[in-house]
Amino acid sequence: TEAQATFCFNLGPDHSGRMLGTLLAASRKGASAPSRHGLATLLYGTLLPGPDIGRRCADILRGVRDAGFDTGVLGWDGVAWQRRVERAAPAWIERQMQRAVARYRDIFGEAPRAHAAAGWQTSAHALRLTQRLGFGFASDTRGTHPFVPVWNGEVTLCPQLPVTLPALDELLGQQGCDVDNLHERLLALTAQAPATGHVFSLQADLALALQ
């Protein structure tokens, strides 16, 4: 059986090396950081310049769409987003999101309909922009069911489809769960799905490293 998915892409510079501590901590739970990301990737943004993902991988990204999958944006610079968005000025947030939308248009020839926030980090202005920039839905949060965000009385008319299940690296951190049985743990969590279903977030690099 083929599983359908929405692929959300980082479309700007790859600065993975700036989160080296986080990557190494995650590697203790499963695949090692070098096998998951490659040694060069662990140096991007520090000792090596971060490659432009959208420009370098445009054909690959279009191939995902051509294979029948929905696509969306994960942002411009995912590392900077996770570190700054909570306290960033509205102008910085808007610039990050607009650059991602513009690059998506360049690659796919149309506006993105889906938005996912890197690391599930967001803010009032970021939520506001999901509506202003015309996204059909976003998955910027974690929760139990779909909802329309309301922040200090301000309604954002872009529905959120929150991630309801733990990520693979989180499952690997649970007692008794390892690479060989994590699929069983995930299936057990979805045995009785809520009326609105589940949303599972999977990082492609981790999935490949665990194969």
Task: Please place each PLM-identified region on the residue numbering.
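Catalytic alpha-helical scaffold of carbohydrate-active enzymes acting on polysaccharides/glycoconjugates
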Residues: T1-A114, G119-P159, L182-F200, L208-Q211
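Positively charged, amphipathic and often flexible ligand-engagement surfaces
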Residues: Q160-N181
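Short, loop-centered acidic/histidine patches that primarily coordinate divalent metals
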Residues: T164, S201-D205
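A generic structural signal for short coil/turn motifs at secondary-structure boundaries
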Residues: E170-L172, A207-L210
